[in-house]
Amino acid sequence: MGILNSISTPADLKALNDEDLDALAKEIRTFLVDKVAATGGHLGPNLGVVELTIGLHRVFDSPQDPIIFDTSHQSYVHKILTGRAKDFDSLRQKDGLSGYTCRAESEHDWTESSHASAALSYADGLSKAKQLDGDTTHSVVAVVGDGALTGGMCWEALNNIAAGKDRKVVVVVNDNGRSYSPTIGGFAENLAGLRMQPFYDRFMEKGKTSLKSMGWVGERTFEALHAFKEGVKSTVIPTEMFPELGMKYVGPVDGHNQKAVDNALKYAHDYDGPIIVHMVTEKGRGYAPAEQDLDELMHSTGVIDPLTGAPKSASKPGWTSVFSDELVKIGAQNENVVAITAAMAGPTGLSKFEANFPNRFFDVGIAEQHAVTSAAGLALGGKHPVVAIYSTFLNRAFDQLLMDVGMLNQPVTLVLDRSGVTGSDGASHNGVWDMALTSIVPGVQVAAPRDEDSLRELLNEAISIDDGPTVVRFPKGDLPTPIVAIDTLEDGVDVLAYEDATDVESTDDAPSVLIIAVGERATVALDVASRIKQHGVNVTVVDPRWIVPIPQSLVALSDDHDLVITIEDGVIHGGVGSLLSDALNASEVDTPRRQIAVPQKYLDHASRNEVLADYGLDADGIETTVVGWLDSLFGE
C-alpha cells in the first residue's frame, strides 16, 4: 500500500504520474476487498469507480467544488481519498464509518441520504446558491448511476440544470449497466476526443452563424451538416438515455482509463455551463469473484472470504424468502395477481415470481411513484398488483398511495420489506415511518406478521381483499421462532399469552396489563411479559395481526385491563400506540396507555440489536421502562 499510504488529502493526488496512478488504483481495489470482506458493504459498485473517483479529486477542488454522489453507496473510494482510510475497519459498525456519505464525518461529504435520483436536484440548488453568491469559479459535480436515471426526479432536475446556461454543473453519469459500449470503433473514439477540444465549440458556433448568414443555401447546408453530425452522434451517444436537453455532452469515456477520465473531467471543469460526462465503468472491476457474479456483481455483500468471495456464514431463510415462495404459490392459483418492483427484484424476493410468470412481472426501474400509480392502473384493469419495495422507499410514493390508489379504493397490495429498524445501513434505510404514513390513508388495511406462518396467512388475506389497498410489512433478517396463538378473537386478533402474577396472595387482586405486540415484536413482548409478572401483575399479550384500522377487540380488551402497553418498531407518533389511543378516546375508555416505540429522530447506524438496545427497545430496556410505569401507577 505504498502509494495509498501517502494519500491523506485529495491534494496529494495531483502530483502523481501515470505509473503512480495505476499503482494507486490497484492498491485501492486490494484495500476495498480486504476491508469490505471483513465488515460487509457495497463492494461491487466501489470497485467500479476507482479511476473515476481518483479523477474527480485530481481535477476538482473538493470541498470548494462540491462532489455529490447519488445514493452514495459508491462513495468508499471518495472516503479513502479524503483521509478516512484508517477508519475502514469500522465501516458500517456502531460509532464507525457510515456506508454512505455523512456530513458529520467530513467536509467533503455534502449529503447523506441513501435514496436514489436526488443528487442532481442537490446539485441544481447548490449551483444556484453559488450563482447568487457571485461564485462563477467553482463547479458542482453530481455523480449519478445509469440506474438512478430511471428515476423521474433526475429528469426533473436535468430540465432545470439545462436551463441554467451559465451555471457550472457537471453531471457525471456512471454507466455500469453494461447497456452501452465505451468504445464503438476508432471513429467514435476520435469524435469523442474532438468534442472535448475547446476549438470545437468555437468552430461549431462560428460555422453555424456563418452558414445561416448565407441565406437559403447556407440554411440548407447547415441543416445537412447538422443531420450528418447528429447521425454520427447517435452511433456514439445513447440518445435514448440522453434526450436533447440542450446540455453539452462528452462521452462515452472509458471509466477505467485514468488518462481518458482525467481529460474528460478537465474539459468539464473548464466548460462554462452545465455538461454531461458519460463514463462507462464495470461494477466489480478487478475482483474475480465479483466479475463472475453475473447477477449482482457483488453489489452488496455480508462478511465474505476475500479470496473466494464466499460468505463466511451460510444465510438462513428469512422473511423475504418466505414472501417470495408464498407469492409464487398465490400466483399459480390466481392469474390476476401481478408483481411490480422498482429495480429490486432480487432484494425484494420477486425474482422467483418473474421466473415463473414473466408476463405478469414488471420492473419499472428506480421509480417508486410510478410503480404505485401503475399498480393502480393494473387494478383498474382487473388485476391484483403486488408492489414489493423496501419500507423506506414507500416514503417517496406516499402521494400516489394516498391519491391514486386510496382515493380510488383500488385493490393494490404493498409488501414492505425491511420495515422497522434495519441497523447498519443507516438512518435513511430504516423502515420506521411506514405505519405512520399508511395509517392516514382512508380505507387502507395494514398487516404486521409475527412469524413465517402469519406472513403466509396475512399475504393471502391481503390479496383476497378486493375493495381497497392493503399493506403487509415485515422486518429485515432471520425469521423468529414460530409463535402459536392460544386463542383467536372474532376479529382475528391472536391471544399469545395469559401470564398470572407471581408473589401475590391472589391473582384476582393483582393489576392487569395488556401488551399489544406489533409484528415480530411479539417475541420480545412474550419475554417481557414473563419478567414483569414477577412484579405482581397479570399480563395478557396479544398480536393484532391487522394493525390498521385498530381492531375493535383491542378497545374492549383495553377497557378490561388496568394498563395498556403497545410495543412496535415504528416511530412513536402516528403508529399503533397513537391509533389505539385515538380509538380509546373515541370510546371513552380511560385505561392508562403507554407506548414502546422508536423515538422521533434519525437513528445512527449500528447493528439492529445495538440500535434496539440503545433506545431501550430490547427486552432489558422494555422491562426497565415498564417496571417504572408499574411502580408509578400501582406502587404503594
Swiss-Prot record:
InterPro entries: Dxylulose-5-P_synthase, THDP-binding, Transketo_C/PFOR_II, Transketolase-like_Pyr-bd, Transketolase_BS, Transketolase_C, Transketolase_CS. Its cofactor is Mg(2+); thiamine diphosphate. Binds 1 Mg(2+) ion per subunit. Binds 1 thiamine pyrophosphate per subunit. CDD domains: TPP_DXS, TPP_PYR_DXS_TK_like. Its EC number is 2.2.1.7. Mg(2+) binds at residues 146, 176. GO terms for cellular component: cytosol. It catalyses: D-glyceraldehyde 3-phosphate + pyruvate + H(+) = 1-deoxy-D-xylulose 5-phosphate + CO2. One of its GO terms (molecular function) is 1-deoxy-D-xylulose-5-phosphate synthase activity. PROSITE patterns: TRANSKETOLASE_1, TRANSKETOLASE_2. Disulfide bonds: none annotated. It is an enzyme of class 2 (transferase). Keywords: Isoprene biosynthesis, Magnesium, Metal-binding, Thiamine biosynthesis, Thiamine pyrophosphate, Transferase. GO terms for biological process: 1-deoxy-D-xylulose 5-phosphate biosynthetic process; isopentenyl diphosphate biosynthetic process, methylerythritol 4-phosphate pathway; terpenoid biosynthetic process; thiamine biosynthetic process. Thiamine diphosphate binds at residues 73, 114-116, 147-148, 176, 287, 368. NCBIfam families: dxs, PRK05444.2-2. Homodimer. Catalyzes the acyloin condensation reaction between C atoms 2 and 3 of pyruvate and glyceraldehyde 3-phosphate to yield 1-deoxy-D-xylulose-5-phosphate (DXP). Belongs to the transketolase family. DXPS subfamily. This is 1-deoxy-D-xylulose-5-phosphate synthase.
